[in-house]
Design a protein with these regions (language model features):
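Short clusters of hydrophobic/aromatic residues that line enzyme substrate/ligand-binding pockets
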Residues: 38-41, 96, 109, 165
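Conserved beta-strand segments that form the floor/walls of ligand-binding pockets within enzyme
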Residues: 3, 26, 62, 75, ...
Length: 197
C-alpha cells in the first residue's frame, strides 16, 4: 500500500482565516506545477497561514501535513522504475529555483537508503504509475523520515505526469544513470506514444 500525508482541499479564504490542519503543513495551488506557489507553514508562525493579497492562484487550495525527512524521487519509464534519487538543497523544500537553477540542488543517485526502503520506493512509484493509468514517463515524489523504523517513514507526495526534461531535470539524469541516453529516452517516448481522444 502507499502512505500519503494527511491533507484537505479548501478555499483560499478559509485557509487564510485559520489553520485547516495542525502546523506544520504545506499549502499548494491546485493548478500549478514545479512547486510554483508552494508555501510551508511552520508551527511557531503567528502570521496568517495565507495572505490572499499574495495568492494569485485562486481556489481550490491543497493543504497537506508536512513530513520531515529526506526528499526522494523516482522516474518510471513504461512499467520500469529507473532508480531512486535523493534531492539535497539549501531551501526549506525543493522549490522552483532549486529545480531549475544549476547548482541549487544536489541529486544523489542512487539514493543511499536501506535496501528495503529503496525497493519500496521503486515499487510504490510503479504502483502509482499503473494505478493512475499513466503512460510514457512519470516521476513520483516521496518524503522519507528515517527516524522511523523500516518503511514506516515513507510517504508518497505526488506523481508528475509531465516531469521536467531540461539538462538538470531528474528523469533524464536517472535514465542516463541506468544506461539510457537522452536521445534514446526521447526516441522511446515518441515510439511508444499513443493518442487518447
Amino acid at each position: 500500500s502507499i502512505r500519503s500525508p494527511e491533507g484537505v482541499v479548501a478555499g483560499a479564504a478559509e485557509v487564510a482565516a485559520r489553520h485547516v490542519l495542525a502546523p506544520p503543513y504545506v499549502i499548494k495551488p491546485a493548478t500549478e506545477g514545479s512547486s510554483v506557489g508552494v508555501r510551508l507553514v511552520h508551527e511557531a508562525s503567528n502570521a496568517p497561514p495565507l495572505d490572499l493579497a499574495d495568492w494569485p492562484f485562486g481556489d481550490p487550495v491543497l493543504v497537506e501535513e508536512y513530513i520531515p525527512g529526506r526528499e526522494l524521487t523516482v522516474g518510471v519509464m513504461g512499467d520500469r522504475a529507473l532508480t531512486v534519487t535523493e534531492i539535497r538543497h539549501s531551501h526549506g523544500f525543493f522549490d522552483y529555483d532549486a529545480k531549475y537553477t544549476k547548482g541549487h540542488a544536489v541529486h544523489e543517485l542512487p539514493a543511499p537508503l536501506p535496501p528495503a526502503v529503496f525497493e519500496a520506493v521503486l515499487d510504490q512509484a510503479v504502483l502509482a504509475h499503473r494505478t493512475l493509468g499513466c503512460a510514457g514517463v512519470s516521476r513520483s515524489d516521496f518524503r522519507y523520515d528515517d527516524s522511523r523504523p523500516g518503511t514506516d517513514g515513507l510517504y508518497f507526495l505526488e506523481i508528475n505526469t509531465q516531469p521536467g526534461f531540461t539538462p538538470v531535470s531528474l528523469v533524464p539524469e536517472q535514465a542516463e544513470h541506468v544506461g539510457i541516453s537522452f536521445r534514446e529516452l526521447c526516441a522511446w517516448l515518441v515510439e511508444t506514444a499513443t493518442c487518447h481522444g
